[in-house]
Amino acid sequence: MSSQVSNFPASIMKTNDIPDVKRSLANFHPNIWKEHFLSFTFDDALKIDEGMKERTEKLKEEIRMMMIAYVENQLIKLNLVDSIQRLGVSYHFEDEVDEFLEHIYVSYNNSLLLSNKNSNGEDLHITALLFRLLRQQGYRISCDIFLKFMDDNGKFKESLVEDERGLLSLYEASHMMGHGEALLEEALEFTTTHLQTYIHRYSNINPSFASEVSNALKLPIRKSVPRIKAREYLEIYQQHPSHNETLLEFSKLDFNILQKLHQKELSEICRWWKDLDVPTKFPFARDRIVECYFWTLGAYFEPQYSVGRKMLTKVIAIASILDDIYDAYGTFEELQVLTPAIQRWDRSMVHTLPLYMKPFYVAMLELYEEIGKEIDKDQNSLHLQVAIGGIKRLSESYFEEAKWLNKEYKPSFKEYMELALKTTGYTMLISISFLGLGDHIVTNEVLQWLSNGPQIIKASTIICRLMDDIASHKFEQEREHVASAVECYMKQYDCSEEEACIELHKEVVDAWKDTNEAFYRPFNVPVPVLMRVLNFSRVINLLYLDEDGYTNAKSGTKFLIKSLLVDPLPC
């Protein structure tokens, strides 16, 4: 669809200097949540009574004692650790989990892990669970431990097909693969094939396990947003005959307590958003403040990161409007004025901007002033410079893309990717998320590491760009829009859309391998820093799995948000 004349109401069009200019409108759907979260008050937060808090602390201590108690059968504790992590409460027991898995690594490194004769090692579930938990913890365990489950032809034994739990554990373990691990690629193909068959054959016989398998095939643990996976797994875990009642009760209480905190944060953010009056001042932009907060929850949900969540959500929201100004509304001439104004970063530049850009520019500057006050009393701190530098570079990248569109330039795939990795905004958003971790974690050394363009961040931007383009390129090409990775790949390699998407997906798979390898010990930066990057990749994997769930937030994304921010768990 070609450019169309803006058809906004006259009252809104008065905000523009040239009301009859032709603009390439995207016609995004309005905010589906309206003022739902504005109704949350501080009194609602107080509904977590003292009795609930006391009960939670008592249960927490009981679980901690389970973790430090001696257990002769280590499989019991392995399953406990796995459940603690999958239920989203491991942040309460980080030291205990670290100590236990280090003990497991040291104790079993020369026995269970490397011996093909150890009888305990013949259990596929145990071996796969051990492998995944240790790799998640940064221990580079060789995938050769799975050789015992392969036949003389280098294929997994067909007898394993009867071990559904073992297959599921191996499937989850295979997603920890790095480069050159053909055995894990074989494991992924083998388990995926047979687990898909299991769902079709036995969904009525064992619906709970079939549901667990179905969820895993769609979103394996390694690529899942922790808070979403916890909500999902809580319903499955309570149906396990061997579930730990103490852990189950604690996890439900913890989920609901955190949900109240998240609702309070979102209410504050929605009030800030309402004061910006986005529907009136920026009617061309995606009104997605609740979705922005959901994105942030994917990056970090733990209570100690409350300030960081509020900062990051606001930056995502401002960056989203900026994206829509460059991508869906601003004329090339207007963008020629906005870009240098952002580079100057000076309130006096407001007078140079078109009327509709003025409130955006002021809001952006005020937001970063607020961030500066939050992270450091010294407004000239390196942390603040990094934050401001990120959005400056993002606007420059957006403008380079606008130049392509203005010239009707069709880049090669390589040329497109060099710029498109910058226009994801992911490097900027990841750096903002770091600021919410605190100076004790994000030191100047970490900021230096960030400035060097580490492979894990590049991998996250690749995942973001390619999954975004695969999901949204058809919608974007309905209007004047720069070519996506799909179109550029099709043109350069003279292939079909389906073939292009298959090849781009392979690059996403390689980016996940880069991500996994960044978690091998010794760590270059603190683990909380690496976890933010991993979680940003997980959010993209969730929101863009089937469609652009940020732009089109009326179906799947709405359900996910409802599960985390509206519906409490029955206790």
Swiss-Prot record:
Biological processes annotated in GO: diterpenoid biosynthetic process; farnesyl diphosphate metabolic process; sesquiterpene biosynthetic process
Binding site for Mg(2+) 1: 323, 327
Keywords linked to the UniProt accession: Cytoplasm, Lyase, Magnesium, Metal-binding
A single Gene Ontology CC term: cytoplasm
Cellular location(s): Cytoplasm
GO molecular function: (+)-delta-cadinene synthase activity; magnesium ion binding; sesquiterpene synthase activity
Cofactor: Mg(2+)
A Pfam match: Terpene_synth_C
EC number: 4.2.3.13, 4.2.3.92
The protein's annotated pathway: Secondary metabolite biosynthesis; terpenoid biosynthesis
Record motif DDXXD motif, residues: 323-327
InterPro entries: Isoprenoid_synthase_dom_sf, Terpene_cyclase-like_1_C, Terpene_cyclase_plant_C1, Terpene_synth_N, Terpene_synth_N_sf, Terpene_synthase-like, Terpene_synthase_metal-bd, Terpenoid_cyclase/PrenylTrfase
Binding-site residues, Mg(2+) 2: 323, 327
Cofactor: how and how many bound: Binds 3 Mg(2+) ions per subunit.
Reaction catalysis annotation: (2E,6E)-farnesyl diphosphate = (+)-gamma-cadinene + diphosphate; (2E,6E)-farnesyl diphosphate = (1S,8aR)-delta-cadinene + diphosphate
Chief localization: cytoplasm
Coiled coil: none
Tissue: Expressed in the rind tissues of ripe fruits.
Annotated Mg(2+) 3 binding sites: 476
Family affiliation: Belongs to the terpene synthase family. Tpsa subfamily.
Domain notes: The Asp-Asp-Xaa-Xaa-Asp/Glu (DDXXD/E) motif is important for the catalytic activity, presumably through binding to Mg(2+).
Function: Sesquiterpene synthase producing mainly delta- and gamma-cadinene with traces of several other sesquiterpenoids, including alpha-copaene. Associated with the production of sesquiterpenes responsible for the aroma of the fruit.
Protein name per UniProt: (+)-gamma-cadinene synthase
